[in-house]
Structures are given as C-alpha cells and as structure tokens.
Amino acid sequence: EEVLNGEGIGRTGRLPRAMTLDECAQYVKTCFSLPNVRIFGELNKMVTTAAVSPGSGKSMARPAFEAGVDVLISGDIDHHTGIDMADCGMAVIDAGHYGTEAMFIDFMRQVLAKEYPQLSVEGMPVKEPFTWI
C-alpha cells in the first residue's frame, strides 16, 4: 500500500516477545480493552510477527500473508477469509471493527485540537453497535 510520511492503513512488526497465539489474543484483548476476540488458527502456535489493520481487514489478508507474518490482527474478518488464512498457516485475530477503531477517536481529537486551536473539538462516546450474549 502507498504510504505517505510513514502513514497508511496497515503495519507489520514484531511482537514484544515470542508467544502462543492464545497469549497473543490475550495481549490484544488487554491492549485494546476488549472482552473477547475471535481467533482463527491453532491456539498453541508460536507467533513472533504480526500485521495490524484497523476495521475490516479482509483486504489486508493477502498482503499480510505475502509479508510472511505469523498473525493478522484486525476486525471484521469473515468466516471464509479467516479459515483460508489459517489453512495457509497465518493465524488471524479478529478484534472487531469497533475494537480496532475506537482508540482512534481520542487520538484524532488531539490531532485536530492541536492543528485547529481556534475550534472546540470533542470526541463522541461510542460503543459496540450490538450486544454479545
């Protein structure tokens, strides 16, 4: 993907340490303050590299696979994409569309407030649009 000044939709990188997919999922839950995530792949698989893409990450599945990462962390991964990636050896953690984008609100509020100090910039509270039971 085209990147401008280091900015763009997805990122790849190394996890803080080698960990199992299960540990990685717990780490994602902690970092994103989420009650749950969906996992495609073997929970005991060791992962060291990750691709992260906010929102719907289906379009980033192939680039993440081609980059050789162990796990794609994204939201809104559909059933077949998740299964296909796991079958190819790349695990997927679906943190949900909301889960991967909610943190952007305050970040963007701060950026806009700094760029346009004459404006009053507020972030709107958001929550998942559905309820897990």
Where are these regions (language model features)?
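Hydrophobic structural segments
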Residues: 1-133
